[in-house]
Amino acid sequence: MDPHQIIIRPVISEKSYNLIENEGQYTFEVDRRANKNQIKKAVEEAFDVKVKKVNTVNVKSKPKRQGFTRGRTSTWKKAVVKLAEGDRIELFEGV
């Protein structure tokens, strides 16, 4: 798989920014079929950094409704990537 097919988008939240500042860990939404090795390789190729560790979580869908219409959000996979000391991803800086 191409790195841009594996990494869907960065997760922008208060918790993810705390992880960046305190732990040097970056959070991404990734393809549900991707494993940790593929995610590691994709992040290293896309951002030119060295990845030390990858943790993944399957985020379950939640029920939602709008008026009488009921539905569910999509199930997605989240990857928390820890980088080597001194490495940073500029995409997250200054937001």
Swiss-Prot record:
Cellular component terms (Gene Ontology): ribonucleoprotein complex; ribosome
One Pfam family linked to the record: Ribosomal_L23
Which branch of life, at top level? Bacteria
Instruction: Name one molecular function that GO assigns to this entry.
Output: structural constituent of ribosome
Q: Which controlled-vocabulary keywords does the entry list? A: Ribonucleoprotein, Ribosomal protein, RNA-binding, rRNA-binding
Q: Which residues cross the membrane?
A: none
A biological-process GO annotation? translation
Q: Which NCBIfam families match?
A: PRK05738.1-3 (NF004359), PRK05738.2-4 (NF004363), PRK05738.3-2 (NF004366)
Family according to the record: Belongs to the universal ribosomal protein uL23 family.
Q: Assembly and partners? A: Part of the 50S ribosomal subunit. Contacts protein L29, and trigger factor when it is bound to the ribosome.
Q: Which PANTHER family match?
A: 60S RIBOSOMAL PROTEIN L23A
* Protein name (Swiss-Prot/TrEMBL): Large ribosomal subunit protein uL23
Annotated source species: Rubrobacter xylanophilus (strain DSM 9941 / JCM 11954 / NBRC 16129 / PRD-1)
Organism classification, top ranks?
Answer: Bacteria, Bacillati, Actinomycetota, Rubrobacteria, Rubrobacterales
The gene for this chain is rplW
